[in-house]
Amino acid sequence: MAASFPPTLGLSSAPDEIQHPHIKFSEWKFKLFRVRSFEKTPEEAQKEKKDSFEGKPSLEQSPAVLDKADGQKPVPTQPLLKAHPKFSKKFHDNEKARGKAIHQANLRHLCRICGNSFRADEHNRRYPVHGPVDGKTLGLLRKKEKRATSWPDLIAKVFRIDVKADVDSIHPTEFCHNCWSIMHRKFSSAPCEVYFPRNVTMEWHPHTPSCDICNTARRGLKRKSLQPNLQLSKKLKTVLDQARQARQHKRRAQARISSKDVMKKIANCSKIHLSTKLLAVDFPEHFVKSISCQICEHILADPVETNCKHVFCRVCILRCLKVMGSYCPSCRYPCFPTDLESPVKSFLSVLNSLMVKCPAKECNEEVSLEKYNHHISSHKESKEIFVHINKGGRPRQHLLSLTRRAQKHRLRELKLQVKAFADKEEGGDVKSVCMTLFLLALRARNEHRQADELEAIMQGKGSGLQPAVCLAIRVNTFLSCSQYHKMYRTVKAITGRQIFQPLHALRNAEKVLLPGYHHFEWQPPLKNVSSSTDVGIIDGLSGLSSSVDDYPVDTIAKRFRYDSALVSALMDMEEDILEGMRSQDLDDYLNGPFTVVVKESCDGMGDVSEKHGSGPVVPEKAVRFSFTIMKITIAHSSQNVKVFEEAKPNSELCCKPLCLMLADESDHETLTAILSPLIAEREAMKSSELMLELGGILRTFKFIFRGTGYDEKLVREVEGLEASGSVYICTLCDATRLEASQNLVFHSITRSHAENLERYEVWRSNPYHESVEELRDRVKGVSAKPFIETVPSIDALHCDIGNAAEFYKIFQLEIGEVYKNPNASKEERKRWQATLDKHLRKKMNLKPIMRMNGNFARKLMTKETVDAVCELIPSEERHEALRELMDLYLKMKPVWRSSCPAKECPESLCQYSFNSQRFAELLSTKFKYRYEGKITNYFHKTLAHVPEIIERDGSIGAWASEGNESGNKLFRRFRKMNARQSKCYEMEDVLKHHWLYTSKYLQKFMNAHNALKTSGFTMNPQASLGDPLGIEDSLESQDSMEF
């Protein structure tokens, strides 16, 4: 039955036989759903038009029209179509905005990195893409010494995704916990593996009508499923579930097998790698799996390890990463070619020791995997060997004797093969392939020196030395700039290579090691000290005029600012501090507070020959102020943990110069003018904390200053005491010389810097209006204002020197038998001294000296010297007394000389009180002729104060001024070698050069050089095959740099 349509639909009035079948379907559809007709009769159309002018909605008032009731079926009719509000421009814009809003709302539920929905995580954990990292991640980054502190930097580093240019309407603003775990796994050594669901980077696009994100969200609303048939038996359910699970397992296994097949095809290494079937021993399956590649399932060849601890052949993993993306083929964890590392040596040794069967015909040998290549090369047939066929003509010349054009012609085939290989395997890097071939050829011929040079060039280092090494050589060998430059040019001209670095490279290396390079901060800021940190060498007068209180200051002084010098010293010790923290099982990220104990030393030098040149006339004497970092501790778990302690506190290598001046130490005004600013900086640092970035982490440091490296003359100068010949014999107690001689042993330390300041005020103001003698007795010898705080102690070096000078005098008096004849003339006394000098030179090889020094004192104070002197003394009784006196002294000496007497000489420490009392008894009986009513300053300190100082400080020898005295010799050496004529510049160069000489960073280079030189690369007969030279056993650390 045909339906008649009005002509408005555009359908032709064709016969029923040829009408398209969809017409009948349309008729049936309108009946079934009672859809209102979209067509109307002409009369209704006119009415619709009229109503539209009145503003009434037309579609609401046009009901479906039925045909006449003549038995025919109703015919759908439709009025003339009118534009719906849906098709207006305004509605279209609203729909577009609404679509974008829905799109952006959908983005909020997706991860920016992997694209997964947050609904998959039952805890709904999410993290902002932009902003700082969370606390847990920040702690991990600090522990691993990473500088990144924001999510965009971490995401770019781990996933190679730049999120800084993200737009909120296109990209999600958060990422999921799974991606957060991947980033944690990247920077931690946790054994867990994290699954990354995508093989490629997720791409995000602006919203479109066919947007995948919005369509996926719509499709998520499913129709309600039908209620399950409750009459279905449990048995049938179980069977269906088992069948479904079996199908899933089968699909997964097939997918796994297919992915393995794909990776094997990608690797395509069956011709170059060995099958596990060639193993000579039938190993367990799990062991075979552990030594085989997880891609090609062959025995590992050139194995590499990923971050997730999976092992592959290098060729296989690189090919898979190139084709399948930067993910581990085993666990899908992110992995990049730069992350690949060689496995541990123990694994490689096991792998190389595996025995494999030779696959060649008629060869039944079993060889280790390490020697397999060498063995298989012997089986090459003669047809595979390139043999030149002499076709006559001119004799064939060697390759190196040909012209460049001829060389190209002869090597053309090889060049094409190498190029093809490089294009296929190495990304077209022909240079690297050729250099590697050359390197392997050199190694095969045992030409390792050339191979090392070539390898250095390939790594971009070149065959030359680093600037820091050249600087260490220059400083250690005392070369001036001009001398080093001559050596640099000579070596470069002779060898044709730049082994040493030019001077400008050394100056750049110097800047890092000198004070004024590193940034730091004080909390609270230092009083009366500039907050700028880029302060290098400054004038010693610190901007004062050329005269102080109308006193002319004829001096040249150069110094570092104290705080800047301490910062540079700490940064120079950075590796030692961090290593000390690791050795104490402390975390690297601990920020303190660290407590730094500093030993201060100051000493005057006489007879410093003046250089000719411009500048003021200055005295031929010098004063040096220096410091040594003795110990660094950190407060941890309610106790102080020692992270650094100076092993050789009296070495010149750790005594850092702070101030140099050409002045007389007895010149009180000049000394105070130059040292007062330095002392003001020191006092300010006592009440502040240093904030310094060490090892990438901001750490806090506190300082304790101990002025112990002063001789007695300088202590009396800076503490305002009378000179050494004063009645008040001691700088530690108030005893007079008479009191000390009557009571040799029992005294205690009473003096202090604060007490000396109070006594100076009493001396200055005389509040009790006393006479000079009474006032002097009240203040116990304080006659000037103290300006440097020193620790009441004994300087071990000067104690040795003072006591040796006294024994030298006793030897002379014993030769002259003064105990019998106390009234000898001056000529006789000179004759005794000449006799002693001549005998010591003959027996002990001790040359006479004008003034006692440390070396002479050490040689003089021995039992052999006493035996030699006894040859000149006739009385046996005096022999015994003299030998006993020396024996007691040698038993006491280690207590004040050793750095830690409780460990090094505990017996001598325990017996010290007894020995000192016996020593005092001998002085007051056998040697009464000299010590009746008087005693020397250092004998008094040795007998009375040593045990108390040891109990307080733990050591006397460690706090001695010996390092500063050794530094005085270096000062003379540096001053001689310097080439600049101006005195001011000369002092700057000496200070800079001396500071670099004490750098621990530079000392490590020279210690390595000295250790190798000492070992001499000698063959150790006891060395194992793995270490034929035995270098590890023969390396020794040197005490100091060689001159």
Swiss-Prot record:
Main location (coarse class): nucleus
Residues noted as binding Zn(2+) 4 in the record, renumbered to the chain: C358, C363, H375, H379
Pfam families membership: RAG1, RAG1_imp_bd, zf-C3HC4, zf-RAG1
Phenotype when changing V433M: In OS and T(-)B(-)NK(+) SCID; found in a patient with an atypical form of severe combined immunodeficiency/Omenn syndrome
Crosslinked positions (Glycyl lysine isopeptide (Lys-Gly) (interchain with G-Cter in ubiquitin)): K234
Biased composition range(s): Basic and acidic residues: 40-54
Cofactor(s) of this protein: Mg(2+); Mn(2+)
UniProt name for this protein: V(D)J recombination-activating protein 1
